[in-house]
Structure formats: structure tokens, C-alpha cells
Curated annotation (Swiss-Prot):
Belongs to the ribosome-inactivating protein family. Type 1 RIP subfamily. One of its GO terms (biological process) is negative regulation of translation. Keywords: Hydrolase, Plant defense, Protein synthesis inhibitor, Toxin. Its EC number is 3.2.2.22. The active site is at 176. It is an enzyme of class 3 (hydrolase). This is Ribosome-inactivating protein saporin-9. It comes from Saponaria officinalis. InterPro entries: Ribosome-inact_prot_sf, Ribosome_inactivat_1/2, Ribosome_inactivat_prot, Ribosome_inactivat_prot_sub1, Ribosome_inactivat_prot_sub2. It catalyses: Endohydrolysis of the N-glycosidic bond at one specific adenosine on the 28S rRNA.
Length: 253
């Protein structure tokens, strides 16, 4: 299993960007391009199913498991308050045997299936967000926020609300930043501060498949055949979307 690590002790914007680029380069098919663009495209599913992301702080490491063929989160690993490694997983996404290969530090007895599902809506419900529209948007983003939410699951008694909030931030700071350079750039621009998220970020996140499909099927030389609106105004030039990684949709059209 490939591991990619982000050091959160004294990170720089450059280190964060190169961490995001490493994930992108690791899962892309270097020979695949869609719509006459040079945007990275995820490679086809292979035997190598998972990618391990490590967040290192001065108090220890918390790890995330992502599916290589779509970057969906499948599990995370953290020490509990007695310094025992525990792996928590979404049971529809990964088997116990695969979890052992991904996080060998946690014994099978210390595997726990999460009581909710891996979609944003379910995680948000468990994060108990009371502000605004009660979505992940209300939590904000940023490297300091990633560090502080990671601290709530690192060497602590498990609290579902804290765990869900950590997952919401960690998913966006890894998988979503890899998919969308727009999000990656917001993080580096505000680095290392927490910043308010915006509707455009959420629109990107929920439209990854739609955007990938439009670029794959309806763009030539980086120009769409018609105007597209993904929730933040009309777009004709693919580059205006600042995409980082497209979904695997087979051969180019």
C-alpha cells in the first residue's frame, strides 16, 4: 500500500501543495487525457485498491484510507486514550482483511465498523453542525483546522461528533483538493489559517462526476461544445474550472 504523508508540525503552503500533487500523481493514468486537456485522470481499477494518507503531528499520527479508483474515504486509524491503535471503517467500502493490509498497526480485534455511511450527508448528521445550513460548509477549511480536528481523535476517547468533523475536514483537504485545484488554491492562499468555506466549494464537490462527464464527452481542445453551469455561473472554457483530477470514464471520446 502506498503511503503519502503530510507533516502538520510546521507545514508550509508549498509542502501542502506538494502533498496534494503527490496524491494526484499517484492515482492518475499518465496516458489518459479527456477533452483535449492535460488534466489528470484517475487510472482504471487495479489490484492495488487503497492509498494511505498519514497526518503527522507532534502528538502522533492519524491515518486515512482512500480508494484509489475514486478517492472515497474508506477508513481511518488513530490511537485511543490508552495508546491502542484502532481502525474505524465504512463496511460497504472495505473488508476486515483489506483493513489489516492498509493499517497493519491495528489488530482485527481493534477494527470497528462505523455506525454511519461514507456519504457527506450521513457524516454531517453525525458531526452535529448547528450553524447555518448545518452542512460541512459551516466548519470552514484550512490547515490549522485540520490540525485541531485531528487532535480531537488522536489519543482520545472516541467521540462520534469529533470523529465526523475530523473526517469532513480531512476528506476535503485531501480528496477534494486533489480533484479541484480551486480548493487546493484556497487552502494555500489562506495558509495556514482557517477560512470560511463557500457555496462554490460545495458545488464543485457535489458535481465531480458531472464535470468529469462533461469534459470527457462534450469538450474539444479544452472548450465545451456548449455553456455548462455547475452551480456557479456559465462555463465554456474547461480551464476556468481549475480542475485537478477527473473521474475515470474509460477511453477518451
Amino acid at each position: 500500500v502506498t503511503s503519502i504523508t503530510l507533516d502538520l508540525v510546521n507545514p508550509t503552503a508549498g509542502q501542502y501543495s506538494s502533498f496534494v500533487d503527490k496524491i494526484r500523481n499517484n492515482v492518475k493514468d499518465p496516458n489518459l487525457k479527456y477533452g483535449g486537456t492535460d488534466i489528470a485522470v484517475i487510472g482504471p481499477p487495479s489490484k492495488d485498491k487503497f492509498l494511505r494518507i498519514n497526518f503527522q503531528s507532534s502528538r502522533g499520527t492519524v491515518s486515512l484510507g482512500l480508494k484509489r479508483d475514486n478517492l472515497y474515504v474508506v477508513a481511518y486509524l488513530a490511537m485511543d486514550n490508552t495508546n491502542v491503535n484502532r481502525a474505524y471503517y465504512f463496511r460497504s467500502e472495505i473488508t476486515s482483511a483489506e483493513l489489516t493490509a492498509l493499517f497493519p498497526e491495528a489488530t482485527a480485534a481493534n477494527h470497528k465498523a462505523l455506525e454511519y455511511t461514507e456519504d457527506y450527508h450521513s457524516i454531517e448528521k453525525n458531526a452535529q453542525i448547528t450553524e447555518g445550513d448545518k452542512s460541512r460548509k459551516e466548519l470552514g477549511l484550512g490547515i490549522n483546522l485540520l490540525s485541531s480536528t485531528m487532535d480531537t481523535v488522536n489519543k482520545k476517547v472516541r467521540v462520534v461528533k469529533n470523529e465526523a468533523r475530523f473526517l469532513l475536514i480531512a476528506i476535503q483537504m485531501t480528496a477534494e483538493a486533489v480533484r479541484f485545484r480551486y480548493i487546493q488554491n484556497l487552502v494555500t492562499k489562506n495558509f495556514p489559517n482557517k477560512f470560511n468555506s463557500e457555496n462554490k466549494v460545495i458545488k464543485f464537490e457535489v458535481n465531480w462526476k458531472k464535470i468529469s462527464t462533461a469534459i470527457h464527452g462534450d469538450a474539444k481542445n479544452g472548450v465545451f461544445n456548449k455553456d455548462y453551469d455547475f452551480g456557479f455561473g456559465k462555463v465554456r472554457l474547461v480551464k476556468d474550472l481549475q480542475m485537478g483530477l477527473l473521474m475515470h470514464l474509460g477511453k477518451p471520446k
